[in-house]
């Protein structure tokens, strides 16, 4: 089993992020607060801080690895940057200028900017103005036709990928004069204006979620609500796109383990492994959880029996339903909505990652003992 630690912190978890040294985790227990826990032992976590500033549910958290700052966003349309001063976390309000909820947030690789996706069909690019001692929000208003569900920074700190409930994945330039430095190479992202769309992908016919870049920035992956995952190589005027369909429930988020391997998590409550072969063709490999070994036919039969039993109130059918639900995943009991790397930024391989979900659990997964099982792609 790849799981090394599982702990239930709340009834439900909206999002989570780790401190630079991985000794603390910040999470939202599906309310207006952010709780910070420190691991004292494998089975014991102590709550050190409760960050209270937002008025509505916290929808996004990211913890910078270099500056040790926490950024949070909420349905209240605001963002806070938290700095540790002594033993207290001090918030700085960032006015996003949104008229709808903020849905997700991520620090840029250089941590001089962060991006916020929103329900206002816009993306906020926020940066710090030293002269005025405040955070400024610049809006990318073009193109999006619906809520922006996820954002992902390219390693070059300029390109930003987004997904939306309009089913599209887009790549924008976020170059800001005075914040970003120009690349001497011709055709670099710095030569494009702020907010200019570089690419639009119309691969999904349903909501799109969980966009991520590979460690090198050469490949882009995101998921659709129709149980599809999409891979895009050579992002630019002539991209190469692949679609992989699977028969189980849709995914919500993905993480590149290496250039040729991706972990997907979502409504099936069990991480899924996708890998690329030597010819560059992506495919589904396996589930990480051991208890997914039950045959699909018996699983679907058990689900039908469960629904049939609930309809007629049969007690005997509910026993079969419990057995079926346990076989679908031995770690999480509900949708996994977040997956976070536990490796250093820029690392070519991710050996550890964490997941959190609507069951209130945070699970830590270790892939070191699974290299032979996962194959050469790892």
From Swiss-Prot:
Its main location: cytoplasm. InterPro entries: ARPC1 (IPR017383), WD40/YVTN_repeat-like_dom_sf (IPR015943), WD40_repeat_dom_sf (IPR036322), WD40_rpt (IPR001680). WD repeats lie at residues 8-47, 53-92, 97-138, 143-182, 203-242, 257-295, 331-375. Keywords: Actin-binding, Cytoplasm, Cytoskeleton, Repeat, WD repeat. The keyword Cytoplasm applies. Disulfide bonds: none annotated. Coiled coil: none annotated. It is found in: Cytoplasm, Cytoskeleton. GO terms for molecular function: actin binding. Gene3D superfamilies: YVTN repeat-like/Quinoprotein amine dehydrogenase. Expressed at low levels in all tissues with a relatively highest expression in inflorescences. The keyword Cytoplasm applies. GO terms for biological process: actin filament organization; Arp2/3 complex-mediated actin nucleation. Belongs to the WD repeat ARPC1 family. Component of the Arp2/3 complex composed of ARP2, ARP3, ARPC1/p41-ARC, ARPC2/p34-ARC, ARPC3/p21-ARC, ARPC4/p20-ARC and ARPC5/p16-ARC. This is Actin-related protein 2/3 complex subunit 1A.
């Amino acid at each position: 089993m790849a799981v090394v630690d599982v702990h239930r912190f709340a009834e439900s978890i909206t999002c989570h992020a780790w401190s630079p040294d991985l000794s603390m985790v910040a999470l939202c227990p599906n309310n207006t607060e952010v709780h910070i826990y420190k691991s004292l032992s494998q089975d014991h976590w102590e709550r050190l801080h409760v960050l209270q500033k937002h008025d509505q549910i916290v929808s996004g958290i990211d913890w910078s690895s270099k500056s040790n700052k926490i950024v949070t966003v909420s349905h209240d349309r605001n963002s806070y940057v938290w700095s540790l001063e002594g033993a207290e976390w001090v918030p700085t309000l960032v006015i996003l200028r949104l008229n709808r909820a903020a849905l997700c947030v991520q620090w840029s690789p250089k941590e001089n900017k962060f991006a916020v996706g929103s329900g206002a069909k816009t993306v906020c690019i926020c940066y710090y103005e030293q002269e005025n001692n405040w955070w400024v929000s610049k809006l990318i208003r073009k193109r999006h036709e619906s809520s922006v569900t996820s954002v992902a920074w390219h390693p070059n700190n300029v390109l930003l990928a987004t997904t939306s409930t309009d089913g599209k994945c887009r790549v924008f330039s976020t170059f800001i004069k005075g914040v970003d430095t120009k690349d001497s190479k011709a055709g670099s992202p710095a030569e494009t204006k702020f907010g200019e769309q570089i690419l639009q992908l119309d691969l999904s016919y349903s909501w799109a979620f969980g966009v991520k870049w590979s460690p090198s920035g050469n490949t882009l992956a995101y998921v659709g609500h129709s149980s599809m995952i999409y891979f895009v190589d050579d992002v630019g005027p002539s991209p190469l796109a692949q679609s992989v369909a699977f028969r189980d429930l849709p995914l919500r988020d993905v993480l590149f383990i290496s250039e040729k391997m991706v972990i997907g998590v979502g409504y099936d409550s069990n991480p899924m492994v996708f890998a690329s072969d030597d010819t560059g063709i992506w495919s589904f490999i396996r589930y990480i959880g051991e208890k997914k070994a039950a045959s699909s036919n018996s699983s679907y039969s058990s689900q039908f029996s469960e629904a049939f039993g609930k309809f007629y109130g049969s007690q005997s059918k509910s026993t079969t339903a419990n057995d079926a639900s346990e076989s679908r995943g031995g770690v999480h009991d509900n949708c996994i909505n977040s997956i976070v790397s536990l490796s250093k930024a820029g690392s070519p391989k991710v050996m550890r990652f964490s997941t959190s979900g609507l069951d209130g659990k945070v699970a830590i997964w270790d892939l070191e003992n699974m290299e032979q099982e996962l194959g050469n792609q790892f």
